[in-house]
Amino acid sequence: MPKQAEYTWGSKKILDNIECLTEDVAEFKDLLYTAHRITSSEEESDNEIQPGAILKGTVVDINKDFVVVDVGLKSEGVIPMSEFIDSSEGLVLGAEVEVYLDQAEDEEGKVVLSREKATRQRQWEYILAHCEEGSIVKGQITRKVKGGLIVDIGMEAFLPGSQIDNKKIKNLDDYVGKVCEFKILKINVERRNIVVSRRELLEAERISKKAELIEQISIGEYRKGVVKNITDFGVFLDLDGIDGLLHITDMTWKRIRHPSEMVELNQELEVIILSVDKEKGRVALGLKQKEHNPWEDIEKKYPPGKRVLGKIVKLLPYGAFIEIEEGIEGLIHISEMSWVKNIVDPSEVVNKGDEVEAIVLSIQKDEGKISLGLKQTERNPWDNIEEKYPIGLHVNAEIKNLTNYGAFVELEPGIEGLIHISDMSWIKKVSHPSELFKKGNSVEAVILSVDKESKKITLGVKQLSSNPWNEIEAMFPAGTVISGVVTKITAFGAFVELQNGIEGLIHVSELSDKPFAKIEDIISIGENVSAKVIKLDPDHKKVSLSVKEYLADNAYDQDSRTELDFKDSQGPKERKKKGK
């Protein structure tokens, strides 16, 4: 008979409104119990697995966008296909893969898994197990980031810009894709990042190579190197790991101002080893030593006095360099450019690129110097200067320059003489030549002296006439009365111009026999005066005059003139009254 059966399942009650046999009810009860036990076991298992764990799962479905993985939890995880790119070749249904548990259950009750995080975790565990700071690892530079590059060493590591290379870096992109060895500088466990260096390995390799090369290298050996740096004093070459200096003086037998005239960066050169300092790790290189030294037989080839033809290659304030053959230059000093001109700048005579003839003056083989002369190719006009301009010769010359001490005149092109200020006038005290002469004017003068060695000629103008002071005693003996014009008034007297331009002085004490306050009260410039010569001093060119003595000698005439002048000063009426 059908009956209503009531069953309990823990705290739950199940009511079956069905008819069944007693044995069927017992079997169904067992099935329900088994299902309950399995479900409880899965829930307990889910609670034991924590996010962050790496699980093994089975691929149960694959499409172009996702991979479905069963890790034995209550739901399957869906992982983007992009996370399987590196291992997509072995990705098939049923394949076993490791995944990272992000979440055991999201908002929708699904398991969240990651293949990429699992891979990174395993890489990090490998690094910690097998590497430490200072370890050498191999990796590939994958991309450029701010401040440096990212390197794949099994996981991503940071390569700072300062640790990329041991030479100057122009473009970081040039390093992307390169596979190199790196040294681990720092491992940060908390942040899970690694800093590596390529530069330290390169530097260590360079030092090792340098030490090895220093031991192997020998003087006189030929080596190839690449120009890595150019300075004012020379060129540094990379000799396969060791730096060598090619000094500017060892680059060429010619004169160069800067190494860049001969070489450029990254240029390969074959050089000769000149010296090796093993203690300091320095190598001196030579380039010119590979060629014949043109200075070896220079003294035979260019003896002093030989005339040479060359090209002006350089002008400097003190002279001009002339190249007389490849690698051989000589200096024409500014003092050797002209016999007669005072050259201030070489460009007054020659220009760069000019071809000129010169005479070899001297050679300093050890110093690599040749002195040349340009003026020596012409006759020296001073050689016969004494015959051409004998003392006493009268000449007409143009005034070229005026100075405080005299006037320079040109006797012929390049030959000048000096008229000293003391040789300009016998009688006039000249303060400056411009009082008598003007630049550009012609003047007649007489040759006074010629100094061939120092190239000096002196002339005189006053010597064209006799010295009036030699005849002064005859012209103006003491006691003579003279007349002259007042030319200058000073505090001590008045100067009067006499015959032939000679000046005499009326001292203030000799101006009058009457008292006066100022000289100007009794005499003025331009006034004609009469005076008596009271003293002559030809050696010192002085003539002393006296108005007072002149007046005393002519007292009567002076008194008469004074009385007459007084009468003339009275009016006719006054004189008439006086007469009454």
From Swiss-Prot:
Domain of life of the source: Bacteria
UniProt record, GO biological process: translation
PROSITE patterns recorded: S1
GO CC, any one term: symbiont-containing vacuole
GO molecular function: mRNA binding; structural constituent of ribosome
Pfam families found in the cross-reference section: S1
Keywords: Repeat, Ribonucleoprotein, Ribosomal protein, RNA-binding
Domain S1 motif: 52-116, 134-199, 220-288, 305-375, 392-462, 479-548
Protein task: Binds mRNA; thus facilitating recognition of the initiation point. It is needed to translate mRNA with a short Shine-Dalgarno (SD) purine-rich sequence.
Protein family: Belongs to the bacterial ribosomal protein bS1 family.
PANTHER family, per database record: 30S RIBOSOMAL PROTEIN S1, SMALL RIBOSOMAL SUBUNIT PROTEIN BS1C
Identification of the protein by name: Small ribosomal subunit protein bS1
Organism: Chlamydia pneumoniae (Chlamydophila pneumoniae)
Taxonomic path: Bacteria, Pseudomonadati, Chlamydiota, Chlamydiia, Chlamydiales
